[in-house]
Amino acid sequence: MSYYFGFTPSVELSATIDKAYELIASKSSERYDVYRDKITQLTSKELMDALLIKLIESLPDDSERKAHLIKTAATIEATSDKLINTLLSPTKNEDVLPSFDFFDQKVLKNTQSGERRISVPLSDELAKNLLATIENVQAGKGLEEQQNLIRLFSELTKACLQHFLVDFTKTLNLNMLKRAAIPVTDGIIVKVIDIALRRLIPQMPQESLERFTKHYQALIFNN
C-alpha cells in the first residue's frame, strides 16, 4: 500500500484529461500539446487551491492577516502561471507523450472507493505523521500540535512541488535557461508558503484547526 496526497479534479480538468487520452489512444493527429498545456495549468491552479486556499478559508473572517494572505496566494498563483507559460511551448505529438505517461503512471490515482484523484506520492513516514497529528488536532489538541502542523505541511508542500515542478518538468524538452528557472521558482514558492504557514497556523483557534485539518485528512489516502 502506498500513500498519496490527492484532490478530486474539477469537471473541466477531468474532462480534459479524458479527452486527451482518447486522442492518444486513437492516434489522432490533433495536437496533444494543447491538452498537455491546459491540464498543466488547471492542475497547478487546483493544487494551489487544495494546498493553500482552503487553509486561508479556515481562518476566522475577522483575522487581520486573512486579506493579506489571500493576496499572497494570488502572488504564488501568478508566479506559478508565469513559470508554466515559460516552460510550455508548441511540441510535436510524439514529444508530448512522456508528459502524458508521467501523468498516467504517477499522477492519476484512485482511492480505494474508486474516486479519481490528482495525486502526489508521500513517504510512509510523512503520511503517518500527518495523519497522527491531524487526529490529535481532531481530539482537541490543536494548540499542542501547531509546530508539528507547520513542519509537516511545509514538508507536504515540498513533496507537491517536487512531484509537479521538478519531476513532471523532466518530461519537457527544455533548454538550459528554462530549466534553470525551475529551482528558482520552487524556492520562491516554498519560502512564501512556509511564511504563510508560520503566520496562519498560530492564529487559528481550535475550531479553525479542526476544520482545516479535516479538509486535509480527506486528501490523504492509500491504495
Describe the role of every protein-language-model region.
Residues 2-223:
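Protein-protein interaction and targeting regions used for scaffolding, dimerization, and localization
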